[in-house]
Amino acid sequence: MTDVETTYADFIASGRTGRRNAIHDILVSSASGNSNELALKLAGLDINKTEGEEDAQRNSTEQSGEAQGEAAKSES
């Protein structure tokens, strides 16, 4: 029993908080992204497209993202 108490005391003294805070870090980092970035990343995952279709969709997605960015700038 003494070994367990010593290990516990060492852990508490180390200041390490354990795995429970890692989830918070993941949620904070994912919340900082925006939905346009997510759409682009998901579009890149589609493996059923040919090269021509992929380029066409990428161009249309980039254009719509730029239009949304310009609209946001004009609103502020």
From Swiss-Prot:
Belongs to the PKI family. The modification N-acetylthreonine is found at residue 2. The record marks 16, 19-20 as: Important for inhibition. Keywords: Acetylation, Protein kinase inhibitor. Pfam families: PKI. Disulfide bonds: none annotated. GO terms for molecular function: cAMP-dependent protein kinase inhibitor activity. This is cAMP-dependent protein kinase inhibitor alpha. Signal peptide: none annotated. The keyword 4Fe-4S does not apply. GO terms for cellular component: cytoplasm; nucleus. PANTHER family: CAMP-DEPENDENT PROTEIN KINASE INHIBITOR/PKI (PTHR15416). Residues 49-76 are annotated as: Disordered. Extremely potent competitive inhibitor of cAMP-dependent protein kinase activity, this protein interacts with the catalytic subunit of the enzyme after the cAMP-induced dissociation of its regulatory chains. The inhibitory site contains regions very similar to the hinge regions (sites that directly interact with the enzyme active site) and 'pseudosubstrate site' of the regulatory chains; but, unlike these chains, PKI does not contain cAMP-binding sites. The arginine residues within the inhibitory site are essential for inhibition and recognition of the enzyme active site.
